[in-house]
């Protein structure tokens, strides 16, 4: 009998990426949080109608909240409730995880940012990261490194 391999997080499982977060911050630690969602939000996530670009995580009174995430309702959403695309959504974390994030985020220059939204066993999960803001020269250095990697790939492609 052959061993069953564990399913890894593949691009098919990813709903939305916050590419801006990795450019503007040094990510020091990542963790996964559940989301308290309404039915119409889950349907919109399945359709891929979500934007994490301006989203951030706020920890207040022992609870973690996702603020600024836009989930656009489907045109066929429920008629008896009025969907709010930018409502504040509660993140589902253990108390120890919230305490660790609170202590770390209180330090100067640190924040908690959403990295990506993905499916795990049929549930929507949010990867969040403890991050420290980059300086302008760090961003420039990263941009130069990306350009150099791209040029190397082009050169190797044309040599072969």
From Swiss-Prot:
<comment type="similarity">
    <text>Belongs to the SmpB family.</text>
</comment>
<comment type="function">
    <text>Required for rescue of stalled ribosomes mediated by trans-translation. Binds to transfer-messenger RNA (tmRNA), required for stable association of tmRNA with ribosomes. tmRNA and SmpB together mimic tRNA shape, replacing the anticodon stem-loop with SmpB. tmRNA is encoded by the ssrA gene; the 2 termini fold to resemble tRNA(Ala) and it encodes a 'tag peptide', a short internal open reading frame. During trans-translation Ala-aminoacylated tmRNA acts like a tRNA, entering the A-site of stalled ribosomes, displacing the stalled mRNA.</text>
</comment>
<dbReference type="GO" id="GO:0003723">
    <property type="term" value="F:RNA binding"/>
</dbReference>
<dbReference type="InterPro" id="IPR000037">
    <property type="entry name" value="SsrA-bd_prot"/>
</dbReference>
<dbReference type="Pfam" id="PF01668">
    <property type="entry name" value="SmpB"/>
</dbReference>
<feature type="region of interest" description="Disordered">
    <location>
        <begin position="130"/>
        <end position="160"/>
    </location>
</feature>
<dbReference type="InterPro" id="IPR023620">
    <property type="entry name" value="SmpB"/>
</dbReference>
<protein>
    <recommendedName>
        <fullName>SsrA-binding protein</fullName>
    </recommendedName>
</protein>
<dbReference type="GO" id="GO:0070929">
    <property type="term" value="P:trans-translation"/>
</dbReference>
<dbReference type="GO" id="GO:0005829">
    <property type="term" value="C:cytosol"/>
</dbReference>
<keyword id="KW-0694">RNA-binding</keyword>
<feature type="compositionally biased region" description="Basic and acidic residues">
    <location>
        <begin position="139"/>
        <end position="150"/>
    </location>
</feature>
<feature type="compositionally biased region" description="Basic residues">
    <location>
        <begin position="151"/>
        <end position="160"/>
    </location>
</feature>
<dbReference type="InterPro" id="IPR020081">
    <property type="entry name" value="SsrA-bd_prot_CS"/>
</dbReference>
<keyword id="KW-0963">Cytoplasm</keyword>
């Amino acid at each position: 009998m052959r061993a069953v391999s564990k399913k890894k997080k593949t691009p098919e499982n990813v709903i939305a990426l916050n590419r801006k977060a990795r450019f503007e911050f040094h990510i020091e630690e990542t963790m996964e949080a559940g989301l308290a969602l309404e039915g119409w939000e889950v349907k919109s996530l399945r359709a891929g109608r979500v934007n994490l670009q301006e989203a951030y995580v706020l920890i207040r009174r022992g609870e973690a909240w996702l603020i600024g995430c836009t989930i656009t309702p489907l045109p066929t959403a429920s008629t008896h409730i009025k969907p709010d695309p930018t409502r504040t959504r509660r993140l589902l974390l253990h108390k120890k995880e919230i305490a660790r994030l609170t202590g770390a985020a209180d330090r100067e220059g640190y924040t908690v940012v959403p990295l990506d939204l993905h499916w795990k066993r049929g549930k929507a999960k949010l990867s969040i990261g403890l991050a420290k803001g980059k300086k302008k020269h760090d961003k420039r250095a990263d941009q130069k490194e990306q350009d150099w990697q791209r040029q190397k790939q082009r050169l190797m492609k044309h040599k072969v």
